[in-house]
Amino acid sequence: MNKRKFLTSAAMLGAAASSAFGQKNVRHDACAASPVLLTVSGAIKHSNRGPLDPALDQLLAKHLVKFDEAYTFDFPSVAGMSRVTIKPTLEYDARPHTLSGPLLSDLLERVGAPGSGDTKIVLRAIDGYAVQTTLDTVRANRFIVATHLDGKPLSLGGLGALWAVYDADRIPELAAKPLKERFVLCPWGMYQIQVNAA
């Protein structure tokens, strides 16, 4: 075995590998974009994607969602909006937790949803749970699209990645209800919002 040739080849291979691994700012476009976490459709003025593709938008199609245009958000685009922090007592452990994220009304304004208070808003979770409310209720209850729980990003498989939620402790008619009944309008794992003009 020629040790010199072996060592030279190993050194060159090591230099090439360290050069490749040392490039921290290399951008791989195929992996650069964050995945979409939230799709807003219906009566909105702004869109950034085309129609639902029944073959590739499987979860949306299974939940009978249809649209010609929609506005999609990834985690950075939601988490990057102006945040609100709330501290409701949660039904799952009967303890107060800190939740933060943008106001749902701000997110709806960003996509150009109608400003009328009787605009219908459907919030849909990945497990198929869906609730309908109005923009008036969204505003009155100060719904947030929570991205963080106790300072950590909400996880898929937990209560996230996004949770439409309000501080039920600060809403007298909800605070008077049993804990298990306070959050019926708050789907965790929210992934789709349908806006219907009144």
Q: What name fits each language-model region?
A:
Residues 5-23:
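N-terminal export signals
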Residues 21-198:
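N-terminal intrinsically disordered, low-complexity segments enriched in P/E/S/T
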